[in-house]
């Protein structure tokens, strides 16, 4: 079944339609507002939120949980970073606002572009990930300006997409020392 899904829905990521040799990070307009789209409190958000924020110095950042937020109001020049998955409803929401966005970035910390990289996962979870990845495949290549990845391995594997490596930078909450509680 996984192989049928892969063959039917996945085409190799050859390039991003919006990406050109002239589109470099240095040429992006100044960003005053950043929306980080994520699904709930995830390890990916905890480990990469600070690193993503640091790429937009001076920008007002808003975390948008796409599981609980149905729509957004976008200021002109806002940048959006999509973490891992983007639902069909949110794909439409971004497209509705695309003319006001300075850039759309897709970030992945696992190899979601290659179903064969997921073979070690339990079958039900692997099938879910493959289906979700396939559902956003064409949208990413059409609407994202750039791809960010978490490791040099992913950057090398997808070098033809010119990805940037965003190293993990855990949120201060993860690094805070807390006192253990006592149970009476």
Predicted stretch roles:
Residues 24-30, 173-184:
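Nucleotide-sugar donor-binding and catalytic loop/hinge architecture
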Residues 61, 104, 163-167:
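Conserved beta-strand scaffold positions in the cores of enzyme catalytic domains, especially
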Residues 145-178:
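Donor nucleotide-sugar binding/catalytic pocket of nucleotide-sugar-dependent glycosyltransferases
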Residues 56, 62-143, 149-153:
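Extended catalytic core of nucleotide-activated donor transferases of GT-like folds
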Residues 2-91:
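N-terminal pre-catalytic "stem/leader" segment of glycosyltransferase-like enzymes
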Residues 37-38, 139-141, 158:
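Intrinsically disordered, low-complexity linkers and terminal regions
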Residues 47-48, 115-120, 161, 177-180:
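Short aromatic-enriched loop/helix-cap "lid" or pocket-rim segments at secondary-structure transitions
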């Amino acid at each position: 079944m996984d192989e049928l899904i892969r063959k039917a829905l996945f085409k190799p990521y050859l390039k991003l339609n919006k990406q050109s040799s002239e589109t470099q990070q240095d040429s992006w307009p100044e960003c005053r507002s950043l929306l980080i789209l994520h699904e709930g409190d995830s390890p990916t958000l905890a480990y990469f939120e600070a690193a993503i924020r640091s790429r937009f110095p001076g920008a007002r950042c808003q975390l948008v949980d796409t599981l609980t937020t149905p729509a957004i109001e976008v200021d002109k020049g806002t940048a959006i970073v999509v973490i891992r998955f983007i639902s069909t409803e949110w794909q439409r929401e971004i497209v509705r606002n695309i003319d006001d966005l300075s850039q759309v970035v897709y970030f992945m910390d696992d190899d979601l572009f290659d179903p064969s990289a997921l073979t070690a996962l339990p079958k039900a979870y692997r099938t879910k990930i493959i289906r979700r990845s396939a559902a956003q495949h064409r949208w990413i290549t059409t609407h994202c300006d750039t791809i960010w990845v978490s490791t040099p391995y992913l950057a090398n594997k997808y070098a033809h997409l010119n990805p940037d490596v965003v190293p993990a930078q855990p949120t201060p909450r993860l690094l805070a020392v807390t006192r253990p509680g006592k149970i009476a």
